[in-house]
Amino acid sequence: MSSLEAIRYARGNLELLDQLALPLETKYIDVRDCNACWRCIKDMNVRGAPAIAIAAALALAVELEAKRGTLTTCEAAEAFVRERFDHMYTSRPTAVNLGEAKNRIQALAKRLSESGDVSGMIEGVIEGCEAMHAEDVASCRAIGDKGAAALLRACGAKDGENIKVMTCCNTGSLATAGYGTALGVIRALWESGRLERAYCLETRPYNQGSRLTAYELVYEKIPGTLICDNMAAALMARGDVDAIVVGADRVAANGDFANKIGTYSLAVNAKHHGVPMFTAAPVTTLDPETATGADIHIEERPGEEVTHSLGKRVAAEGIDVWNPSFDVTPAALLTGVITEHGVIEKNASGLFPVADFVAQAKGGT
């Protein structure tokens, strides 16, 4: 069975799967311009660090295609690209992928504008946006394969021995252009016959685990069990978790990483129980310019996400709410960082050489 599609794109047309409607309804939102994409990202109709970056790039491609006749100079076209992506970046700035996409496409537009050929420039920018979509699918496949091997090694799994893996939030086909990052690792284990069971945390308060990851596991017939966030330690204590793999929205130069709220607690429990803990993300999520996790901006969400469920209040009127969307897990709690170019492991000094790894990956070595 083919994977779910969070993003449907053909030249001039973009549809985003409305993930707020899942798992009760499967419907797509027609995105005609960057303003509509900004709203979809802000409201979390589309979410997942890779997916929002790809959605933003393709929304720009759609709007550029529609405005071919009105952008008559390279200067106007470059200014348009710069303004549109700057605006979309404000939707969810914690995820480094969105900023990486913004910088990449804006730099491409600036370079192409020097030709003086506005038609060729617009075509080149659109093709650049489309290339990001294809690249993400390929990188997720590589993350899955490399991650599956890394988890089996970390668990000391013998030939033919299957493992039980825990994850949180949603990092599969719904969070990327296809296949997934952390859930892609689980998917690769299943496809190779090495997965016994996947455990997904519900991931309060937005329930991406229960609404989305459980939906993907059932859709693809991968053996999975849904648990509440506060059950993870008890499951580890029973010896029912061989490894943990989660996603990341930003990985700092020292290996600290921001991910969905609750990841830090999961990592602390994993360390106590001796369970190897990995994060899986494309190289675009690695941010060597951010020194440590203390420098990562953490988005805070509306309190209603905690006080209400399915539109109905479930908490006392007047109670204060703190609702950060992410937390930062210290690198000391991490076993490795899985990317499409390989796994970053601690060096002899006990540090993750993120900056060196990124430089080598971007240099093609």
UniProtKB/Swiss-Prot annotation:
SUPFAM superfamilies: NagB/RpiA/CoA transferase-like. Pathway: Amino-acid biosynthesis; L-methionine biosynthesis via salvage pathway; L-methionine from S-methyl-5-thio-alpha-D-ribose 1-phosphate: step 1/6. Its EC number is 5.3.1.23. The record marks C169 as: Transition state stabilizer. This is Methylthioribose-1-phosphate isomerase. GO terms for biological process: L-methionine salvage from methylthioadenosine. Belongs to the eIF-2B alpha/beta/delta subunits family. MtnA subfamily. PANTHER family: METHYLTHIORIBOSE-1-PHOSPHATE ISOMERASE. InterPro entries: IF-2B-related, IF-M1Pi, IF_2B-like_C, Initiation_fac_2B_a/b/d, M1Pi_N, NagB/RpiA_transferase-like. Its main location: cytoplasm. GO terms for cellular component: cytoplasm; nucleus. NCBIfam families: eIF-2B_rel, PRK05720.1, salvage_mtnA. It holds the Pfam family IF-2B.
